[in-house]
Amino acid sequence: MDEKKIIIDRAVLVGLNADCFTPEETSSEKTLDELEALLETAGGECVGKVLQNRHTPDPHSFIGEGKADEVRQMVQNGGANLVIFDNDLTPSQLRALEDLMKTPVLDRSALILDIFAQRARTREGKLQVELAQYQYYLPRLTVWNEEMGRLGGGIGTRGPGETQLETDRRYIRSRIQKLREELAEVRKVRAVQRQRRIKNSVPVVALVGYTNAGKSTLLNLLTGADIPANNRLFDTLDTTTRQLTLS
Protein backbone atom coordinates (compact mmCIF):
# COMPACT_ATOMS: atom_id res chain seq x y z
CA MET A 1 0.00 0.00 0.00
CA ASP A 2 1.34 3.42 -0.93
CA GLU A 3 1.92 5.71 2.03
CA LYS A 4 0.96 9.36 1.55
CA LYS A 5 3.80 11.71 2.40
CA ILE A 6 2.91 14.28 5.06
CA ILE A 7 4.73 17.58 4.61
CA ILE A 8 5.80 19.20 7.88
CA ASP A 9 7.02 22.75 7.25
CA ARG A 10 9.95 23.90 9.38
CA ALA A 11 10.15 27.67 9.39
CA VAL A 12 12.30 30.54 10.59
CA LEU A 13 10.16 33.46 11.76
CA VAL A 14 11.34 37.02 11.10
CA GLY A 15 10.00 40.33 12.38
CA LEU A 16 11.03 43.95 11.81
CA ASN A 17 10.59 46.75 14.32
CA ALA A 18 11.18 50.05 12.50
CA ASP A 19 11.01 53.51 14.07
CA CYS A 20 8.72 54.71 11.28
CA PHE A 21 6.17 51.90 11.76
CA THR A 22 2.77 52.39 13.35
CA PRO A 23 1.93 50.12 16.32
CA GLU A 24 -0.09 47.93 13.94
CA GLU A 25 2.84 47.54 11.53
CA THR A 26 5.64 46.83 13.98
CA SER A 27 6.84 43.43 15.13
CA SER A 28 7.80 42.42 18.67
CA GLU A 29 8.56 39.33 20.73
CA LYS A 30 4.86 39.11 21.54
CA THR A 31 3.74 39.24 17.90
CA LEU A 32 6.44 36.70 16.95
CA ASP A 33 5.07 34.37 19.64
CA GLU A 34 1.62 34.78 18.09
CA LEU A 35 3.09 34.11 14.65
CA GLU A 36 4.57 30.88 16.03
CA ALA A 37 1.12 29.89 17.31
CA LEU A 38 -0.30 30.60 13.85
CA LEU A 39 2.42 28.46 12.28
CA GLU A 40 1.57 25.58 14.62
CA THR A 41 -2.11 25.98 13.77
CA ALA A 42 -1.18 25.66 10.08
CA GLY A 43 0.70 22.45 10.85
CA GLY A 44 4.24 23.83 10.85
CA GLU A 45 7.14 23.97 13.29
CA CYS A 46 9.28 26.96 14.30
CA VAL A 47 13.05 26.34 14.29
CA GLY A 48 14.16 29.91 15.03
CA LYS A 49 13.11 33.54 15.41
CA VAL A 50 14.76 36.79 14.36
CA LEU A 51 13.63 40.25 15.51
CA GLN A 52 15.43 43.15 13.85
CA ASN A 53 15.38 46.82 14.88
CA ARG A 54 15.95 49.41 12.16
CA HIS A 55 15.21 53.09 11.64
CA THR A 56 13.45 52.32 8.34
CA PRO A 57 12.91 49.14 6.31
CA ASP A 58 15.39 48.46 3.55
CA PRO A 59 13.57 49.61 0.38
CA HIS A 60 14.81 46.59 -1.57
CA SER A 61 14.97 43.66 0.82
CA PHE A 62 13.06 44.95 3.88
CA ILE A 63 15.63 43.68 6.43
CA GLY A 64 18.83 44.35 4.47
CA GLU A 65 21.22 41.92 2.81
CA GLY A 66 23.29 41.31 5.95
CA LYS A 67 20.32 40.26 8.05
CA ALA A 68 18.92 38.24 5.14
CA ASP A 69 22.19 36.31 5.00
CA GLU A 70 21.94 35.69 8.75
CA VAL A 71 18.44 34.27 8.28
CA ARG A 72 19.69 32.13 5.39
CA GLN A 73 22.30 30.60 7.72
CA MET A 74 19.60 29.89 10.32
CA VAL A 75 17.53 28.16 7.64
CA GLN A 76 20.44 25.93 6.69
CA ASN A 77 21.48 25.16 10.27
CA GLY A 78 17.93 24.45 11.43
CA GLY A 79 16.89 22.37 8.44
CA ALA A 80 14.10 24.82 7.64
CA ASN A 81 12.30 24.92 4.30
CA LEU A 82 10.38 28.16 4.79
CA VAL A 83 10.78 31.73 6.08
CA ILE A 84 7.72 33.57 7.40
CA PHE A 85 7.70 37.31 8.08
CA ASP A 86 5.62 38.83 10.86
CA ASN A 87 5.18 41.92 8.69
CA ASP A 88 3.36 42.22 5.36
CA LEU A 89 5.70 42.30 2.36
CA THR A 90 5.36 43.82 -1.11
CA PRO A 91 5.78 41.60 -4.19
CA SER A 92 9.21 43.13 -4.91
CA GLN A 93 10.35 42.53 -1.32
CA LEU A 94 9.21 38.91 -1.52
CA ARG A 95 11.22 38.39 -4.69
CA ALA A 96 14.33 40.08 -3.28
CA LEU A 97 14.22 38.08 -0.05
CA GLU A 98 13.77 34.77 -1.85
CA ASP A 99 16.71 35.59 -4.10
CA LEU A 100 18.88 36.49 -1.10
CA MET A 101 17.87 33.60 1.17
CA LYS A 102 17.33 30.91 -1.50
CA THR A 103 14.21 29.85 0.43
CA PRO A 104 10.46 30.30 -0.08
CA VAL A 105 9.17 33.34 1.83
CA LEU A 106 5.66 34.04 3.11
CA ASP A 107 4.29 36.90 5.18
CA ARG A 108 1.74 36.92 8.00
CA SER A 109 -1.20 37.52 5.65
CA ALA A 110 -0.31 34.50 3.49
CA LEU A 111 -0.02 32.31 6.58
CA ILE A 112 -3.43 33.39 7.89
CA LEU A 113 -5.02 32.80 4.49
CA ASP A 114 -3.54 29.29 4.50
CA ILE A 115 -5.18 28.62 7.88
CA PHE A 116 -8.47 30.00 6.60
CA ALA A 117 -8.26 27.66 3.59
CA GLN A 118 -7.95 24.72 5.99
CA ARG A 119 -10.72 25.82 8.36
CA ALA A 120 -13.52 27.09 6.07
CA ARG A 121 -16.45 24.68 6.09
CA THR A 122 -19.52 26.53 4.78
CA ARG A 123 -20.05 27.55 1.15
CA GLU A 124 -19.89 31.22 2.10
CA GLY A 125 -16.70 30.72 4.09
CA LYS A 126 -14.99 28.86 1.26
CA LEU A 127 -16.02 31.53 -1.26
CA GLN A 128 -14.70 34.29 1.00
CA VAL A 129 -11.36 32.56 1.50
CA GLU A 130 -10.92 31.80 -2.19
CA LEU A 131 -11.70 35.43 -3.07
CA ALA A 132 -9.24 36.72 -0.46
CA GLN A 133 -6.51 34.39 -1.73
CA TYR A 134 -6.94 35.45 -5.35
CA GLN A 135 -6.93 39.14 -4.37
CA TYR A 136 -3.77 38.59 -2.33
CA TYR A 137 -1.89 36.56 -4.93
CA LEU A 138 -2.88 38.48 -8.07
CA PRO A 139 -0.18 41.19 -7.66
CA ARG A 140 2.25 38.50 -6.47
CA LEU A 141 1.54 36.04 -9.29
CA THR A 142 5.09 35.76 -10.66
CA VAL A 143 6.64 35.33 -7.21
CA TRP A 144 3.97 32.81 -6.21
CA ASN A 145 4.54 30.66 -9.29
CA GLU A 146 8.23 30.43 -8.40
CA GLU A 147 7.33 29.58 -4.78
CA MET A 148 5.09 26.74 -5.89
CA GLY A 149 8.00 25.05 -7.58
CA ARG A 150 10.12 25.31 -4.45
CA LEU A 151 7.52 24.41 -1.81
CA GLY A 152 5.96 21.46 -3.61
CA GLY A 153 2.96 21.54 -1.23
CA GLY A 154 2.35 22.50 2.37
CA ILE A 155 1.90 25.91 4.01
CA GLY A 156 1.12 28.66 1.55
CA THR A 157 -0.01 26.32 -1.24
CA ARG A 158 -3.49 25.35 -0.05
CA GLY A 159 -6.73 26.88 -1.25
CA PRO A 160 -7.73 27.62 -4.84
CA GLY A 161 -5.18 25.16 -6.21
CA GLU A 162 -1.82 25.29 -7.90
CA THR A 163 -3.05 24.94 -11.47
CA GLN A 164 -5.54 27.79 -11.12
CA LEU A 165 -3.04 30.24 -9.64
CA GLU A 166 -0.51 29.39 -12.34
CA THR A 167 -2.86 30.66 -15.02
CA ASP A 168 -2.87 34.18 -16.39
CA ARG A 169 -4.13 37.32 -14.70
CA ARG A 170 -7.15 37.49 -17.00
CA TYR A 171 -8.49 34.21 -15.67
CA ILE A 172 -7.91 35.24 -12.05
CA ARG A 173 -9.68 38.57 -12.53
CA SER A 174 -12.59 36.72 -14.13
CA ARG A 175 -12.69 34.27 -11.21
CA ILE A 176 -12.63 37.15 -8.70
CA GLN A 177 -15.68 38.68 -10.39
CA LYS A 178 -17.47 35.32 -10.37
CA LEU A 179 -16.76 34.83 -6.67
CA ARG A 180 -18.09 38.29 -5.86
CA GLU A 181 -21.32 37.48 -7.70
CA GLU A 182 -21.70 34.15 -5.86
CA LEU A 183 -21.07 35.83 -2.51
CA ALA A 184 -23.68 38.46 -3.32
CA GLU A 185 -26.25 35.69 -3.83
CA VAL A 186 -25.30 34.02 -0.54
CA ARG A 187 -25.62 37.34 1.27
CA LYS A 188 -29.10 37.85 -0.19
CA VAL A 189 -30.17 34.60 1.45
CA ARG A 190 -28.65 35.73 4.75
CA ALA A 191 -30.50 39.05 4.46
CA VAL A 192 -33.82 37.23 4.02
CA GLN A 193 -33.09 35.12 7.11
CA ARG A 194 -32.28 38.24 9.13
CA GLN A 195 -35.46 39.96 8.02
CA ARG A 196 -37.48 36.88 9.03
CA ARG A 197 -35.97 36.95 12.52
CA ILE A 198 -36.75 40.67 12.82
CA LYS A 199 -40.32 40.13 11.62
CA ASN A 200 -40.83 37.36 14.18
CA SER A 201 -39.31 39.56 16.92
CA VAL A 202 -36.54 37.06 17.61
CA PRO A 203 -33.79 38.69 19.73
CA VAL A 204 -30.34 38.27 18.24
CA VAL A 205 -27.23 38.09 20.44
CA ALA A 206 -23.68 38.07 19.05
CA LEU A 207 -20.63 36.56 20.71
CA VAL A 208 -17.60 38.66 19.83
CA GLY A 209 -13.99 38.11 20.85
CA TYR A 210 -10.41 37.61 19.68
CA THR A 211 -9.43 34.32 18.09
CA ASN A 212 -9.13 31.50 20.64
CA ALA A 213 -10.90 33.59 23.31
CA GLY A 214 -13.49 30.86 23.96
CA LYS A 215 -16.48 31.95 21.86
CA SER A 216 -17.28 28.44 20.59
CA THR A 217 -16.89 26.97 24.08
CA LEU A 218 -19.33 29.54 25.49
CA LEU A 219 -21.82 28.93 22.66
CA ASN A 220 -21.67 25.19 23.34
CA LEU A 221 -22.34 25.76 27.05
CA LEU A 222 -25.26 28.11 26.41
CA THR A 223 -27.02 26.21 23.64
CA GLY A 224 -25.84 22.61 23.93
CA ALA A 225 -24.27 22.86 20.49
CA ASP A 226 -21.41 20.58 19.48
CA ILE A 227 -19.15 23.05 17.70
CA PRO A 228 -15.45 22.05 17.63
CA ALA A 229 -13.68 24.12 20.29
CA ASN A 230 -9.97 23.35 20.24
CA ASN A 231 -7.24 25.40 21.89
CA ARG A 232 -5.75 26.90 18.72
CA LEU A 233 -6.02 30.10 16.71
CA PHE A 234 -8.76 30.41 14.06
CA ASP A 235 -10.14 26.95 14.87
CA THR A 236 -13.68 28.09 14.06
CA LEU A 237 -13.78 30.28 10.96
CA ASP A 238 -17.40 30.23 9.83
CA THR A 239 -20.23 32.19 11.44
CA THR A 240 -22.43 29.85 13.47
CA THR A 241 -26.06 30.43 14.51
CA ARG A 242 -27.81 28.48 17.28
CA GLN A 243 -31.11 28.85 19.12
CA LEU A 244 -31.15 29.58 22.86
CA THR A 245 -34.27 29.28 25.02
CA LEU A 246 -34.30 31.23 28.30
CA SER A 247 -36.62 30.10 31.07
Regions found by a protein language model. Give the residues of each.
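N-terminal accessory targeting/assembly segments
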Residues: M1-R108, I112-L113
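Conserved G1/Walker A P-loop phosphate-binding module
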Residues: E3-A11, F21-T22, W144-S247
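A residue-level signal for conserved active-site and pocket-lining positions in enzyme catalytic cores
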Residues: L35, Y134, I172
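Short alpha-helix plus adjacent loop in nuclease-associated cores
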Residues: A110-A132
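A charged, well-structured terminal subsegment
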Residues: L131, Q135-M148
